Structure formats: structure tokens, C-alpha cells
Amino acid sequence: MLTFYYRFMQGLDEQIGKRPLQGSRQGARQVGLAYNGNPMKHPTVANPPTRLWNWRFLAPRYWPIWLGLGLMKVMAALPFRWQLTAGGQIGRLLGRIGRRRRKIAAANLALCFPERSPAERAELLDQHFTALGIGLFETAMAWWAPDEQLHDLAEIKGAEHLEEALARGKGVILLTGHFTTLELGARFITWRQPLHAMYRPHKNPLYETVMRRERERRSRLPPLPHDDLRGLLRAFRKGQAVWYAPDQNHGLRNSAFVPFFGIPTCTITATSRLAALSGAAVVPYFPRRLPGAAGYVVDILPALDHFPSGDVLADTQRINALLETHIRQVPEQYLWVHRRFKTRPPGSPNVYPL
């Protein structure tokens, strides 16, 4: 189940640099990526069905997914306090049985918080798995809970910054990170503004169909496959907002080593290049769950000024510093089970257990 949830969290995968962007050759080169010559093909899913009720999905191999989705719909209807309690218990269980991911998260915390004692990091690790379990319920709420169930739970701060950026008419890159609250945070934003979500299509056609269906239903705009440069630029020309989170490791291609928690970290550089190519404003936003059952706050910050600066490395480092600041506010709610430091500078040792 931990692997399922981890892969789910990667579903909103913004990594424009992992695979060559598809669209115009000139545009792809301006972003700094290769062009593969086929603007229509998304090879991750071959001809996924567009309807949820499809005879293919009655095959036994899809039954576990149907069961999981059914449980998530039930979870979304539970009282909020029950969700927090049950989610926390599930997360703690995942932390005990998901030994590999627990070791990865522990390695990440040791790298990023060397100033904390081993006991403090162990406590933070337990809190992280609690947040992961709650994140399952938050995902269910994001997809299936009615608005009236959620309105009293969320406070959006700084909505005027998003409105001002959209008023420019050149589109907005809604910049964030992979927090356990990411699906619910995006749902809260859509109350103010429809948005596209950059994501990597899922290999399983049933999960891909459900994921696209629910995100489009709530976001009011279709998700964009991460290699669809043409669709991305079209959205910006229409003055639309696009969800984007450049904080995961996908290798050296179109990446650079810049500091993140003081560690040279392989980081996608496409944010700066996309902003330069499209003229879109970059508006950071960060959702966070409040202590107890107090709900959520979504902090929308002013559009980044003097961005892009013309220095891609400086721009990328600026984004990492911004992410680090907000991760430190709620460190347990960041996705530490991802191997963020997998790609290392030449001569540097592997930081993760085998």
C-alpha cells in the first residue's frame, strides 16, 4: 500500500525534463529539451479509455484497484476527525511495514536536518508516516468530498496575488512542492481559479482514467501530460494557470546541481526556461495542514519578481531556497520517501541503503 501511495503522489509529476517535451522543435529547444518529432504520442499509456465504465476494466487484474478506489470513496465521507485518526494509524502501520521507504525517508531527514538529534529525527520520521497516512484520506477528500464538506476546513491567504498575476493575461505557473497535502491543496485553489495539472500519465489505464476524470472534474481544466509542450504553451496563451512542482529527482538531463538544504541536489531547470519562453508569471503556493483538527491554510505568495533573471542556475537555486523555507514550516508533511538525492555529483557516495 505504501508503494501504491508513493506512486500516486508521483502522479502529479511535473517533471518536464524527464522525457523530451513534445510540441514544436523550436519551443522545445528554447526550454532546453530535446524534440522527439511526434507532438501527439504519449507512450506511457497506449490508447487509454476515456470512459470509466469500460469492459476492459472488469478484468480480474483491475479488481484490487476497484477495491482501493471504493475504499477511498468511503473514506472521503467520514467525519474529518475520524479521517485524521484513521489516517494517522494507517500511516504508522505503513511506516512499520514499508521498511525500504522508511530507510529512504530516514536518510533524507539525516541529510537535511543534521542539526537535530537522532531522537528528534526519529520522531520526525514517525510524524512523516502519520502525515502520509492522513494524505490518503486527503486525496480521497480532494477527489470525492463535496465542497460544503471542505469549505470550513480551508483558509486561503494571498488569493489577490494569483488574481493579479492572472490579470497580466500571459498565464501563471503555480509553483509548489510535493507535500502530502498536494491534491487537497490543489482542490482548494480551484475554488478561486481553474487550473491544469502537469502530470506523468499512469501506466495502468484504469487508474489513469480515474485520475484524469477526477482531476478534471474538480480542476475544471484537463490535466496536461508532462511532455505536452504544445498544450502547455496553449494554456499560457489563454491566460490559464498550470500546477507545477519541480522538486523531484529525474536524472541529469535538463537538470543542474544546486543547493537544497545545503546539499548539491540534481534539480530540474525548466521553470526558468518555461517562464522565459512563455512569459507566464511564477506564483508560489504552499498548502499545510494545521495542528489538531483545525483544518488547512493555503499560502499564495506574490509572483516572483525579476524571474526569470537570465541566469538559469540562479533561478533554480532561488526556487529550491523557497521550497526549503516552506518545508521547514511543516517538515513532516513533505514527501521524504522520494529519493531526492539519488543522482549525486561525480565522486559523491550513494546516500540511500540498497
What are these regions (language model features)?
Residues 13-14, 18, 36-38:
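Intrinsically disordered, low-complexity polyampholyte segments enriched for Lys and acidic residues
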Residues 36-176, 181, 208-213, 219:
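Membrane-anchoring hydrophobic helices of lipid-metabolizing enzymes
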Residues 167-227, 249-261:
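Catalytic core of membrane glycerolipid acyltransferases/transacylases, capturing the structured
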